[in-house]
Every structure is written in structure tokens, then in C-alpha cells.
Amino acid sequence: MVENKSSYELPDQKTLDMNKEWVQELEDIFYSYKKYDVNKVRVQQFLDRRSDFLVYDFYTSNLSMDAMQYFQAGVTQKDVGLSKDYILLMRKLYSMLTEPSKQFFQEQFVKEWQYHEIDYTPYFETLVPRFREKIARLLDEIVKNPEEVDDDVQEELRWHLLFSPVTTLLDIFTRCLKNFEITGFCLNVCLKVPQLFFDRPLKIYHTEYETDRVESLMALVFRRLIFNKRWVDTSDEEWSNLEQLARVICSGQEPSLMSAWPLLEVVLCELYTQNRTPMISVEVLSEIAVKIVENFDNLKYATSARTKPAENVLLTPSIICFLLNIIVDENVSNTVIENCKMILKAIGQNMEQPFDAEAKSYLTSKVLKEFPWTLEFAISTWFKALEVEKRRIPSAVYKAINAEMKETFDERTFDIEESETVDQSINEEDEERCSTLSSESSVKTAISIDHKSDTAVDNLEMNQLHLSPKPKASVEAVKSCKPAFVAVIFEEIPPETDQNISVFEDPTIEVLTEYLDCIITMGVFDISCADELMRHSSVTFESSEQLEKVMKTAFEENFEIANAGPQRIKEISGKILEVFGSTSSESDHDRIASSIIELIPTEEYEKTGPRWSHDIKKSEIIQPLVIPVEATLESWPPAEYRYVAPGIKESRDSARHERLLRQQLATTKSLEMAQLHRDLWAENEKNMEHWTRPASPCNSSFFAESSVKPTTSSAYGNSSNFSRYAD
């Protein structure tokens, strides 16, 4: 390959002559394409001719402009073979340019490609025989030894990337997921075509699974890569490499091929779309979002629930809502839940401006109240932008708060009206189970339900009735109807004797257990929020033995602990012992924590579920939480004048019909008169002499002595005009 270096100095005469001849011939061929009069033999001879020199930079600008100016004619020849030859001519020209000239060529080619409203690159690929196979062979060569790749292979891959960016880049990234060691080399090739990257908006063809809009090449390819990997069985290693690829793309050399904002937008939109198969794809996407939100502090956050997606900011209210919905989804993994919590926490810490009044009211009054208290408390704590004056907590925790701190908290109650609303949403099947649950439950269990903490009801709901947890108050709804629930099943137990048969001998233990149950539930969701509640608590334990007993009972009865692993259980128990067991030694803390971990079953379940899916929904764009209703102008006439009496309506219809007939008659007469005028005008010979093309003069010389008089039209004068020259 000829050394590709810029040379603005005038080359030697021999090279300059070769340049002139070569450039002139290529210009003639390009011009023949413009006239659709191409000599196929000449084109083939030009392509077969070997040229071992670089085109002088002085000629390349005009030559590149000609190639783009005639490009549309070149790829639309009647003979498809000639169109394919035009692409080969452009490829030959591109290979003989210096690096600065290649950059100019690339810029002009992208302009020509983007000039049209429709993306024609899928058609371009048909003009290159075995286009995808060539890309695959090039990538195979790169995989053999990524450190030592021939320059010809690199330049060929670069040309394919310029010629068809989406297909080539998608194939490159797909291979990078399988052979991650070639990522560095492939990204260097991308850097050689900067006209396609660095968040430049491009008009690109979108499939039916994508929202058609102008966006960057990297954003579209990354989204399509996720789609393709969900469509087929993809290994965990490839999904892990996808996360690494996103990190390399955004955190590489400056400026990076893709900034953090468009990548985060793609990832959040994919989480927003109801595509949850395979689950590992959701885990990877949420992990990417966590890394971006935590490490990039220059992101913009919407403070209004009406902010539109086009404003290039994160729609924070909408993001809060759909991430909370993912967290309470029973089908998502713990990894996804933890990542969503980290995203929300990072966004809350990064937001500097408070939400506007409408967004605050909507989120606190309508959204957060629909979720369990742990989510409401955590969001109110993380998002200072909500400016929540009093964070709501359950009664068991609220009663234990220090008197001086109670002004910053509020008791979360469950109204009867809300309970009735929730009851309507409960399954009839579940209601049947509630009403017909019978002798399989022991009397001891039933008695403890009526007199223990609300936790026992929670356990019964989850373990014995097999009810699905509901976002709003599946637990609280059952708590609200607990006395009636127990009375239906155990009618033989007199209410006045309930206090004597409680499973707890000491009512203080019952209160403490209920309190720790709430703290554990909060700790499973967020350990820092649980620690804050304990620090503001007035609860005390008489001894370390009492604390250990209450902790074991609370951990054993808490159904949320099933979502926590051994490490989280150790953290929660450690925090409880740190706050309430300060008199105990560290060895006692370790012993108690170890005994609790042994008490809680922590079986590790294998990841199951489909590895791929063809039931993939169209990728959606995050929408505003509140979509304003645009005011429409009232139709005319006003409503009070729209009534028309029956007789008037027929009269108006008749008049309208008559007007249409007269209009048609007038139009017909006008056309006839215009045609008659044109015919009469054309019959006039005088008009025809001035408006028609004159006859060509004869070829005889003006000074020739000939008896034959030249025949000319009056437009060139009669023969007498030339007689004076003949004399």
C-alpha cells in the first residue's frame, strides 16, 4: 500500500503528469455518469489499471466534489452493473487519497448521504456484492491478531464503515461482544471517521421496533445491539461484555465516541419499555445506568412533571415512577432492584434545583402513597428536591421516635376508604382463600395472629395464602381487616379472652418485636434509612439477652428478609446491635449476627427463565408524567347557534347545490374560451414566425461566387443582404 501522508508540496514532474492524466480520465468517467452515457469497457479498463501513487491534494477537492455531485446519477443507472462500478470508482479514489483528503471526502460523503430525507444506505449495500460477508472476513482477520493488523484490512473496514455505517458498526460491536480483545482496534477505526460520531445527529433508517427520530449513530446502534441480543440466546459473558463496551465507549479518550447523556437516554428508555426478557439484559442496562448517574455530575434533571423529552434533560418525575414500578415488580431479580435503588439515590443526591409545586404535589400525594412505606420514606429522604416536611412512617416506628424529632415525621395511617378501594382490586380467588381457610392452620398460629404484631399477618398473607404483594397496600389492607378476618375463621374464641392467650408473655416484647420488624423491613430496602430511624428512636432494651431474643423473633417472622442475602442480614443485625447493644462486646455482636444468619434460610436459587424472546415490544421514549391538554379553538358557529330548523336546512342544501353547478359551468366555459384563443393564435403566421425555431442557414460561404442563392429564413435576412458582399 502506498504510504498515506499529506504532501502539499508539488511532486516531481513524472508523478504530476500521471496525476493529471489519471484525474482527467476519472473526471470524464464521472461526467459520463451524469449524462447516463457510460462506456462500460472504459470504466472496466480504468478499474483494472494499477495505480501506485497518491493523488496530489490540489486535485482531490474538486475530484471528491465531482464524485458526490454525480453520486445520485451514479447509483441510479439503468444498468445495475454500472452503478456497482461507480461504487468501485469511489473506492479506488478513496484509497488513493492522503489522510487530509480522506477527511474531506468523508465529510462530503456524509453530507450527500444526509441530504436526502430517506436513508438510502440499505440500497447502497446491494451495490456491493457480498457486503456482509466482506465485513465478516475483515473481522476474522482482526481477531487473529488484534495487535498486528495489516493497513489494508484497516482501511477496508474504514471504507465499509463510511459507506454503510449502521450495518458495519453493528457487525463490529457484535463481534466485540464475542471477542472483546478487538474492541480497542475497532474503536480506533471508528475514530478515523469522526464525521459519524461524537453525538452528531443523523437521519437513519429505523425498524418497526424503534421510534423514528433523528439521533446519533452510536445511540441507534447500541439500542439495536440490545434488541438483537434479546432476540437470540446470548451468553452471560456477552452481556457482561456489553456493559464493558458501554464503559469503554463513554470513558475512553477525550472526546469520547459517545457522551454519557445519549447512552443514559438509551438505557433508561429500554428500562422504561416493558421488555424484561431475558432478565440479565435488564440487570446489565440498570448497571450501566448506575455507573453513568454516579460518575457524571453534569447531567440535567427536569424539575417539572410537564417537561418534554425534546428538551435534552432527564425527565426525573417519570424516571422516579417507572423505577419504583420495577422495584415492586415480583418478576425482577434482586440485582435489578438494587440497581434501581442506586439510580434513584444518585439522582436524588445530584439534583440541585427543587421540583416545582405541581411535581411535588403529584409525586407526594398521588405517586408515593401508592407504594409501600419503605419506598415512600426512602424517596422522601433521598430527594431533597421534593422538600418533604414530614416523612411518613408506620405507627410502630412513629411512637418510638424521640419527642424532639417527631416534628420531622408523620404517622402513616391506612384509611378505611383506601382499604375499601384496595379490597376491590384483590382477586376473587384470593378473597375465597381468605374466607375458606380452615383446619390446616393450627390454633396456636391463629391465636398468635390476633395478638401478635402485624408481622404475623404479613407472614400469613405471604406464606399460607400465597397472595401476591401489591404496590399500594396488600399488607396494609389485610392489616386493616385483621379482626374480622380472624373472627370469621375462629368464631369459637371469645374476644374478651384474647389478651390471655397471646403468644407473647410480655407485651413489651411484642411492641419491641413489632418495632424491629419495621426496622428490618426498612433495612432490607435501604440500610442508611433504617439507621437514621434507629438513631432517632427512644427504644431501649433491658439486657443483651432481651435484645437477642427480640431480634431472632423479628428476623424469623419478617417476610421481607427473604429478599436479603447473608451480607445484608449481617449489615442489618450489625446496625441494630450497634445502636441498641452498645453495652455488649464485639464478640457478642458477631455471635448474635452469626446465629441470626443461621436461623434465616438463605438458599441460593439458580437463575432460571427464558434466555431470549421474540415477543419484544417497540422501544418507547420516556414521556412526561403529566401531559398537558392543548386548548383547542371552539368550532364555528358557537354551540348556541348550531341548531338549524328543518326547512332552512333543505333550502341551504339546495342553494349550495346550485352554486356548485354554476361554478362547474363557468369553469368549463373558461377552459373552452382559453383553448379557442390558443388555436386562433397559433393559426396566425406572424405569431408562428416569432415563436418557432428558425431554419438553419446553408453551409455555403458568404463570399463564394455562386449562382445559387442561399436559402435563409427572414430571421437571418433575405438574400439581398448578402449581394453587396458578392459584388
UniProtKB/Swiss-Prot annotation:
InterPro entries: TPR_Edg1
Phenotype reported upon loss of the gene: RNAi-mediated knockdown results in enlarged deps-1-containing clusters.
Main location: cytoplasm
Subcellular location: Cytoplasmic granule
Region (Disordered): 703-727
Subunit structure and binding partners: May interact with deps-1 and prg-1.
Role of this protein: Plays a role in regulating deps-1 cluster formation in the germline.
Protein name, as recorded: Protein edg-1
